[in-house]
């Protein structure tokens, strides 16, 4: 498939662009680059910024790996593809800010190709982005979802609501009965209507991520915070760790396929904490996160209703 080279070129360019923009807004640290090879086939480049002025740790990873047999995490929903050789390439990033008022965020765009001698390759795209605030602001939630909606709109009226719901359902800690954050977009197994359109969509998602995230960083980066806010941020980061290690398909795929553990676990926060039976104080900003932000909401419909009433 000659189209694979175009996807790879886009992904490498996306990684470079995102790193440049994040380093520029941080202003206190730069990305360290770590190129690596995988014994089973392929390799990648991990870029990590640590100890920044704004970002405590940010990892932006590119990988292009090959293998002789799809691991279970990639073929669970497509049992007909079990045993096929595969290529997988993508950019995955996680941003853990220092300030508790700036949300953690994650984004990913990827391409899978499953191959079998004598048959046409089976390909599909996946990805999305999501936001995990510690202290919620409605203005930020509406902006985040408006950005997601607008980039989806050229591809059909049903795309945003479908992928928003998928995101709400996917980034949910079943063992806690609790959402990880306020969602965004999530999609997988995308191969319709054709390769060109599917590729155009992941370009829109990848290029649109910082349009959603950086304005939130700018709004919140200078807010004062102290030990209370930091403790709550670290406690909520524990939920992030739980999701990634228990439920995340990307983490499971990486580990099951013999991926590079350092790069796979790059998504982990540098610090997190757990408390036994933690309960936020009633009517506190911490309680508002659970009450007003973690339950799935139609942020855009609520915003439009409010604007009409105003």
UniProtKB/Swiss-Prot annotation:
The record marks 175 as: Important for dimerization. Pathway: Porphyrin-containing compound metabolism; protoporphyrin-IX biosynthesis; protoporphyrinogen-IX from coproporphyrinogen-III (O2 route): step 1/1. Residues 240-275 are annotated as: Important for dimerization. Keywords: Cytoplasm, Heme biosynthesis, Metal-binding, Oxidoreductase, Porphyrin biosynthesis. Coiled coil: none annotated. Its cofactor is a divalent metal cation. GO terms for molecular function: coproporphyrinogen oxidase activity; metal ion binding; protein homodimerization activity. Pfam families: Coprogen_oxidas (PF01218). A divalent metal cation binds at residues 96, 106, 145, 175. One of its GO terms (cellular component) is cytoplasm. Gene3D superfamilies: Coproporphyrinogen III oxidase, aerobic. GO terms for biological process: protoporphyrinogen IX biosynthetic process. It catalyses: coproporphyrinogen III + O2 + 2 H(+) = protoporphyrinogen IX + 2 CO2 + 2 H2O. The active site is at 106 (proton donor). It is found in: Cytoplasm. The keyword Protein transport does not apply. Homodimer. This is Oxygen-dependent coproporphyrinogen-III oxidase. It comes from Pectobacterium atrosepticum (strain SCRI 1043 / ATCC BAA-672) (Erwinia carotovora subsp. atroseptica). The lineage of its organism: Bacteria, Pseudomonadati, Pseudomonadota, Gammaproteobacteria, Enterobacterales.
């Amino acid at each position: 498939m000659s189209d694979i080279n175009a996807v790879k070129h886009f992904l490498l360019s996306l990684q470079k662009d995102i790193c440049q923009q994040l380093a520029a807004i941080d202003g206190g640290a730069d990305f360290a680059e770590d190129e690596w090879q995988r014994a089973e086939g392929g390799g990648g480049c991990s870029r990590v910024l640590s100890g920044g002025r704004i970002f405590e740790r940010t990892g932006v990873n590119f990988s292009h790996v090959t293998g002789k047999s799809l691991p279970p995490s990639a073929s669970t929903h497509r049992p007909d593809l079990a045993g096929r050789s595969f290529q997988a390439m993508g950019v995955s990033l996680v941003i853990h800010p220092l300030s508790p008022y700036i949300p953690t965020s994650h984004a990913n765009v990827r391409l899978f190709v499953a191959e079998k001698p004598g048959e046409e390759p089976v390909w599909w795209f996946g990805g999305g982005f999501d936001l995990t605030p510690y202290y919620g602001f409605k203005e930020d939630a509406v902006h985040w979802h408006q950005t997601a909606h607008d980039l989806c709109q050229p591809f059909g009226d049903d795309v945003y609501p479908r992928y928003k719901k998928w995101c709400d359902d996917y980034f949910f800690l079943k063992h806690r009965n609790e959402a990880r954050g306020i969602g965004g977009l999530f999609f997988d197994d995308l191969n319709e209507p054709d390769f060109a359109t599917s590729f155009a969509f992941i370009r829109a998602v990848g290029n649109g991520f910082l349009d959603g995230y950086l304005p939130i960083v700018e709004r919140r980066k200078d807010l004062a915070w102290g030990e209370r806010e930091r403790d709550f941020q670290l406690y909520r980061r524990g939920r992030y760790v739980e999701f990634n290690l228990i439920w995340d398909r990307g983490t499971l795929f990486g580990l099951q396929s013999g991926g590079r553990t350092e790069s796979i676990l790059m998504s982990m926060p540098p610090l997190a904490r757990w408390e036994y039976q933690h309960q936020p104080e009633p009517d506190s900003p911490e309680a508002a996160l659970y009450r007003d932000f973690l339950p799935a909401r139609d942020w855009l419909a609520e915003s439009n209703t409010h604007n009409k009433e105003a």
